[in-house]
């Protein structure tokens, strides 16, 4: 089973394109959705029998989208093609290929295991650390799809990182 955890930026591109009336429609490249990520995501989303895997999203990523909604989706809001209700509806009834992981005490415990910096000394932000902690709390091998190239240097068991 393939588990793909998306960060907030990748999730924002997915939400720009997601149509609940066509939940298995593939995504296209966007600002943050890059070629390799896209191939991996579409292999899950377009799998009609649901056996290839899941897109995992931390509840925290949705909180970030809601908190920064008017900045992240400024263009879509002006064109009236995105609303906060759409984000909330996705949280309340996610597509069959999406798992929304709670941010809870287990996340906090795993957060303590995330290093503050990578080997080069570059800092790992608290936001990124929450996404990493979410990946760790699952206990499965998981691929983190992120826009943060610093995380490509991360060396943690069970987590691989894709930035393109």
Language model feature labels by segment:
Residues 10-14, 67, 80-98, 103-111, ...:
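Anionic, Ser/Thr-rich low-complexity intrinsically disordered regions
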Residues 50, 71-75, 93-97, 117-120:
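General structural signal for alpha-helix termini and helix-helix connectors
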Residues 66-70, 136:
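Short, amphipathic alpha-helical segments that act as regulatory/interfacial helices
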Residues 96-143:
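Active-site neighborhoods of divalent-metal-dependent phosphate/nucleic-acid chemistry enzymes
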Residues 1-60, 72-82:
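Short, well-structured N-terminal submotif of metal-dependent ribonuclease cores
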Residues 1-5, 18-30, 132-164:
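Acidic, PIN/NYN-like endoribonuclease modules and their adjacent C-terminal/linker elements
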């Amino acid at each position: 089973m393939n588990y793909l955890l998306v960060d907030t930026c990748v999730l924002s591109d997915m939400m720009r394109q997601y149509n609940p009336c066509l939940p298995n429609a593939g995504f296209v490249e966007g600002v943050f959705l890059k070629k390799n990520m896209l191939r991996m995501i579409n292999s899950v989303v377009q799998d009609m029998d649901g056996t290839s895997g899941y897109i995992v999203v931390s509840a925290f990523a949705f909180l970030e989208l809601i908190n920064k909604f008017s900045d992240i989706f400024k263009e879509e809001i002006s064109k009236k093609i995105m609303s906060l209700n759409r984000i909330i509806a996705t949280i309340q009834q996610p597509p069959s290929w999406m798992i929304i992981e709670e941010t809870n005490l287990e996340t906090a415990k795993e957060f303590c295991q995330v290093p503050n910096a990578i080997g080069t000394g570059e800092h790992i932000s608290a936001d990124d650390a929450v996404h990493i902690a979410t990946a760790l709390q699952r206990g499965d091998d998981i691929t983190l799809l992120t826009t943060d190239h610093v995380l490509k240097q991360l060396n943690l068991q069970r987590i691989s990182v894709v930035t393109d």
